[in-house]
């Protein structure tokens, strides 16, 4: 009887330790930035970052909950401890680094313009080219100058408080009328309604949106841009959560090395966005 009691106690102790060691992480996403993250039928969250978050949580041996949060409040709610991490196509920028910390990158950011196919802007030069604002700075600046001249006097929509809005402010302010929106869906609607001449956003998001009936007639134009203001995409974290950062870093590194990020990239974007 004593041996049985001791064994039962030992099993309960081991089970208790295992439960205590299991991490519980709440991850916020925007839920309106397809195909990175979006709300599907019944409000279920889906997309590249939902799949990747689940894969990372499995590698971290963590129990994760993914919640939707409006973009405008996504960083304040993190610092206010409403959740533990952000996976919402958030690029790492110096301004954001003043407020929160970041994991190592899990995706590269590539951005471009979209217009309606019957617009004169559909002939924007540079289609098929991709310029890095870092390693191809001179070529990128020339391409930007060409586009700025081409777009002169037009109205361009962009989601506010994003790297895309920063890019427009830096390179196009004065030559175009910049109109900021709360979401990509909102500026896409104004594009198709004729209230905008062009929009700038993540190219993977625009490519997915253009395939939908509500964006019929829209097309990607001009070159794509990466690096610089667009940077890389990483998990947003509170600066003090160094242990959680280490866990995410290790999981992302493993997901990059074993091809998980590439597989999910090809599934959702048809291109590999694994950081190089």
UniProtKB/Swiss-Prot annotation:
Its main location: periplasm. It is found in: Periplasm. Residues 1-20 form the signal peptide. SMART domains: PBPb, PBPe. One of its GO terms (molecular function) is ligand-gated monoatomic ion channel activity. It comes from the Bacteria. InterPro entries: Iontro_rcpt_C, Lys_Arg_Orn-bd, SBP_3_CS, Solute-binding_3/MltF_N. GO terms for cellular component: membrane; outer membrane-bounded periplasmic space. CDD domains: PBP2_OccT_like (cd13699). Induction: By octopine. Keywords: Disulfide bond, Periplasm, Plasmid, Signal, Transport. PANTHER family: AMINO-ACID-BINDING PROTEIN YXEM-RELATED, MEMBRANE-BOUND LYTIC MUREIN TRANSGLYCOSYLASE F. Component of the octopine active transport system probably consisting of four subunits: Q, M, P and T. Belongs to the bacterial solute-binding protein 3 family. This is Octopine-binding periplasmic protein. It comes from Rhizobium radiobacter. The lineage of its organism: Bacteria, Pseudomonadati, Pseudomonadota, Alphaproteobacteria, Hyphomicrobiales. The gene is occT.
């Amino acid at each position: 009887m004593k041996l049985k009691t001791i064994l039962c106690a030992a099993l309960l102790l081991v089970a208790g330790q295992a439960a205590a060691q299991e991490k519980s992480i709440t991850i916020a996403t925007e839920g309106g930035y397809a195909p990175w993250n979006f709300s599907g039928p019944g409000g279920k969250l889906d997309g590249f970052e939902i799949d990747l978050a689940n894969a990372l949580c499995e590698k971290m041996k963590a129990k994760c909950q993914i919640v939707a949060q409006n973009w405008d409040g996504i960083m304040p709610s993190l610092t206010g401890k409403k959740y533990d991490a952000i996976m919402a196509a958030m690029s790492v920028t110096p301004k954001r680094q003043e407020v929160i910390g970041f994991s190592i990158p899990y995706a590269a950011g590539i951005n471009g313009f979209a217009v309606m196919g019957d617009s004169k802007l559909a002939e924007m030069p540079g289609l098929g080219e991709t310029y890095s604002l870092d390693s191809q700075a001179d070529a990128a600046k020339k391409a930007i100058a060409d586009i700025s001249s081409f777009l002169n006097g037009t109205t361009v929509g962009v989601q506010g408080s994003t790297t895309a809005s920063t890019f427009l402010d830096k390179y196009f302010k004065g030559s175009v009328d910049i109109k900021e929106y709360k979401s990509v869906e909102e500026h896409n609607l104004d594009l198709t309604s004729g209230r905008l001449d062009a929009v700038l956003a993540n190219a993977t998001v625009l490519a997915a949106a253009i395939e939908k009936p509500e964006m019929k007639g829209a097309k990607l134009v001009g070159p794509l841009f990466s690096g610089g203001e667009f940077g890389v995409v990483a998990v947003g974290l509170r600066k003090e959560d160094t242990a959680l950062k280490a866990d995410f870093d290790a999981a992302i590194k493993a997901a990059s090395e074993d091809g998980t990020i590439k597989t999910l990239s090809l599934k959702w974007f048809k291109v590999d966005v694994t950081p190089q």
